[in-house]
Amino acid sequence: MAQWWLILLGLWTVLPSLAGGKLLNVCMNSKHHKQEPGPEDKLYFECMPWKDNACCTRDTSWEAHLDEPLLFNFSMTHCGLLTPLCHKHFIQAICFYECSPNLGPWIQPVVPNRQEEQRLWDVPLCLEDCEEWWKDCRTSHTCKADWLHGWVWDQGKNGCPAHAPCLPFSDYFPTPADLCEKIWNNTFKASPERRNSGRCLQKWFEPTHGNPNVEVALHFAGSASAPQLSYSITAFSLCLLLHA
């Protein structure tokens, strides 16, 4: 019987890391993502932080920098040009979404129980990321808080719905959290944690300082796998007791 308890102890030790590993260093199953992350030494400007290990290609990184990114067939100039600083935040957010291999814990199927296409859900952006994005965009204009749904499409281009006036971002997004969480329909979540806390993700970082999101993904991958593993190993433990 002692040998079974040794095996059980080993399971408690090893399985969490194995299960969490499935959520690490992965790419989404999505239109523009590579199947596996890897080096891409010719990524454009704001996508460069991921050049050593990226889920995006050079072409994807180039398209992310356009005023009307071909990636989503979506015009960010529906209420006129964004300010340069505001536009830069959106480029960084698109690069983060397309290039990061550290988003595994937040990947969800678009259709429940099917993995043909995936999306991100509640990615915890650091407090400073949301605050700076909101501050630099509050004087730019938009006509909607949800940029994923409810547009009027004409000749393949998105336009504002009737009775949806172009107003400063701050009218549609009164707080930094509103901007982070509403604009792409809960793709991001405004975290109360700060950068370098190990508990939130940065949508951009200095490449020379290393990727801080690796540690964060590791933490959340372990947290995500813990409940299911605990249930499975507890059930196995009860079986051992019943047959002792």
Curated annotation (Swiss-Prot):
Disulfide bonds join C27-C55, C47-C95, C56-C99, C79-C166, C86-C137, C126-C200, C130-C180, C143-C160. It is found in: Cell membrane; Cell projection, Microvillus membrane. The keyword Glycosyltransferase does not apply. GO terms for cellular component: external side of plasma membrane; microvillus membrane; plasma membrane. Residues 223-244 form a propeptide. Keywords: Cell membrane, Cell projection, Disulfide bond, Fertilization, Glycoprotein, GPI-anchor, Lipoprotein, Membrane, Receptor, Signal. It is a lipid-anchor; GPI-anchor. GO terms for biological process: cell adhesion; fusion of sperm to egg plasma membrane involved in single fertilization; single fertilization; sperm-egg recognition. One of its GO terms (molecular function) is signaling receptor binding. InterPro entries: Folate_rcpt, Folate_rcpt-like. The keyword rRNA-binding does not apply. Residues 62-81 are annotated as: Important for interaction with IZUMO1. Glycans are attached at N73. Expressed in the oocyte (at protein level). It holds the Pfam family Folate_rec. The protein is rapidly cleaved following fertilization, being only weakly detectable in zona-intact fertilized eggs at telophase II and undetectable at the pronuclear stage. Sheding is probably required to block to polyspermy and ensuring egg fusion with a single sperm. Residues 1-19 form the signal peptide. Belongs to the folate receptor family. Receptor for IZUMO1 present at the cell surface of oocytes (oolemma), which is essential for species-specific gamete recognition and fertilization. The IZUMO1:IZUMO1R/JUNO interaction is a necessary adhesion event between sperm and egg that is required for fertilization but is not sufficient for cell fusion. The ligand-receptor interaction probably does not act as a membrane 'fusogen'. Does not bind folate. Monomer. Interacts with IZUMO1; the interaction is direct. IZUMO1 and IZUMO1R/JUNO form a complex with 1:1 stoichiometry. Interacts with FCRL3/MAIA; FCRL3/MAIA replaces IZUMO1R/JUNO as IZUMO1 receptor after sperm-egg adhesion, thereby permitting species-specific gamete fusion. Interacts with WDR54. This is Sperm-egg fusion protein Juno. It comes from Rattus norvegicus.
